[in-house]
UniProtKB/Swiss-Prot annotation:
Protein name: Protein OPG166
Organism: Vaccinia virus (strain Western Reserve) (VACV)
GO MF annotation, one: thrombospondin receptor activity
One matching Pfam family: CD47
Residues bearing carbohydrate: N29, N58
Coiled-coil regions listed: none
Gene encoding the protein: OPG166
Length: 277
């Protein structure tokens, strides 16, 4: 009877289930290390996601069996104690991960996905500031042009065109905020940035109506076109999570500066051919 009791106690010492840990991951993580430490010598290590096997390592034959859904999975170390799992982001799924050995020792880790902002708060704030200032300067340019010339069809087209640009970019700003990486926010950012090309058309209309098309105006237009190219390139590089929006901000900032130059040129260099009311 005493032998049976000793055997049961011996078995119970190996049926240990460690406390569950929680680990958060984001799209910014290229790989995830799921920790697991087993101090007792074992014949094999098995990693599971819920009830599905991910990886089985046989220490005797030193062979590894992988799930076809987790081909990037591997053990962090082949030492006797450290059997942490390394897995790439493309194969990561949220859920409960369990590592166990042939003696029944288990370690459970709950993996939770945490959603992050598309851009950091500083870059998001600058995007709204640059866009807002650009639209305000556009409004001033159109207002100055409207009060400086007699109303005509071309002036009406300029006013309608400016209103359409402003509405599209404002709607885009509402869709983009807060800057999460979803389809809605991607559409919002596209609406905030791509209509900037039409600012060049409004600029040409304003200078043409005020008879100010000169070499300096061409330089301003080329400068703004360069800003738009930077914006498009930055936008193309930003169509994924956890990216640096510096190039996109450079383009939006260049467009904003060109709008400043345009307004200064309109106000400070009056045309002798203007027709007032």
């Amino acid at each position: 009877m005493s032998r049976v009791r000793i055997s049961l106690i011996y078995l119970c010492t190996f049926m240990i289930i460690t406390s569950t840990k929680t680990i958060e991951y984001t799209a910014c993580n290229n790989t995830i290390i799921i920790p697991c430490t087993i101090d007792n010598p074992t014949k094999y290590i098995r990693w599971k996601l819920d009830n599905h096997d991910i990886l089985t390592y046989n220490k005797t034959s030193k062979t590894t069996i992988l799930s076809k859904w987790h081909t990037s999975a591997r053990l962090h170390s082949l030492s006797d104690s450290d059997v942490s799992l390394i897995i790439e982001y493309k194969d990561i799924l949220p859920g409960t991960y369990t590592c166990e050995d042939n003696t029944g020792i288990k370690s459970t880790v709950k993996l939770v996905q945490r959603h992050t902002n598309w851009f950091n708060d500083y870059q998001t704030m600058l995007m709204f500031i640059f866009t807002g200032i650009t639209l305000f300067l556009l409004f001033l340019e159109i207002t100055y042009t409207s009060i400086s010339v007699v109303f005509s069809t071309n002036l009406g087209i300029l006013q309608v065109f400016g209103c359409v640009i402003a509405m599209i970019e404002l709607c885009g700003a509402f869709l983009f905020y807060p800057s999460m990486f979803t389809l809605r926010h991607i559409i919002g950012l596209l609406m905030m940035t791509l209509p900037s090309i039409f600012l060049i058309i409004t600029k040409v209309f304003s200078f043409w109506l005020l008879c100010k098309l000169s070499c300096a105006v061409h330089l301003i237009i080329y400068y703004q076109l360069a800003g738009y190219i930077l914006t498009v390139l930055g936008l193309g590089l930003s169509l994924k999570e956890c990216v640096d929006g510096t190039l996109l901000l450079s383009g939006l900032g260049t467009i904003m500066v060109s709008e400043h130059f345009s307004l200064l040129f309109l106000v400070c260099f009056p045309s002798t051919q203007r027709d007032y009311y």
